[in-house]
Amino acid sequence: MPSGPPVTSASSPDSDAPASTSSDARASTNGDAPASTRHRDIVVLKGVRKSFGETEVLRGIDLVCRHGETTCIVGGSGAGKTTLLRLVVALDKPTSGSIYVDGVDIVPMSERQLTDVRQKFGMVYQYAALLDSINVLDNVGFPLVEHTKLSRAEIRQRVVEKLRILELDESVLTKFPAELSGGMRKRVGLARALMLDPPIVVYDEPTSGLDPVTSRAVDDLIDDTRRRFGVTSLVITHDIASCFRLADQAVLLSKGQIAARGRPQELAHGDNEIAEDFIRMSGIDVDAVLAGRTRR
């Protein structure tokens, strides 16, 4: 089948100043972002390129992440996913192009200004980056110690509140990471990422190395977190099944370029040859995965 142009999303970065979203309006009574802000463009990349020496790793990336939605960046090893992630969360700068977060171009910012930008992102890594030498209370409360002047009692209260929402009770507070199951570690790591109430939560390979049942449970947790906290989710993954279950917007990255993008149904049943090959090599039952989507 001939390869046509990439499937495109309904939104494209075609304005100089993307609409910003007030973080005060993130949550609604049912946990979703309110309709008035849900479709604002909270992260926008325009013509982003990144080179390391003579090697161009990202080639003209245009991307829009909408407030309250889940965008999944999927691709194989070497596609450029990790580099793209580091640029979005302000850990590195592009060689050229613009990156807007909440309507503001972060590329020209100083390191001091970028420190504030980074607090807009809650990071959940493939392996929950918990400190083995301290208990759950101190692990989860660490961002509050670093960035606020709250008392120990106030920090404990906020930690307990977050853990309860994520279905963990106070009995875990005194446990150390080595005592936690894999699922509990994921939840504890997520609680820590949410402590500063970031509008955007970024998941780096959340289902890597997990069996299908556990992967589905993690997907459910990601979507439940989006609904309960009213956050925008950005998921970096090689797992096309997870991507199709979660995404409002699925973006296939290949050789540093966006090869296809759109709703999962569009990628699954479109006429893009690169997407077809990636799905076929994954070996998934596309229709079964789409039938079990967390998002409708």
Where do the protein language model's features map onto the residues?
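Conserved ABC ATPase "signature" region
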Residues: V104-D105, A153-S171
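A short, proline-enriched helix->beta-strand linker immediately N-terminal to the Walker B motif
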Residues: M195-P199
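Catalytic Walker B motif of ABC-type/P-loop ATPase nucleotide-binding domains
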Residues: V201-D204
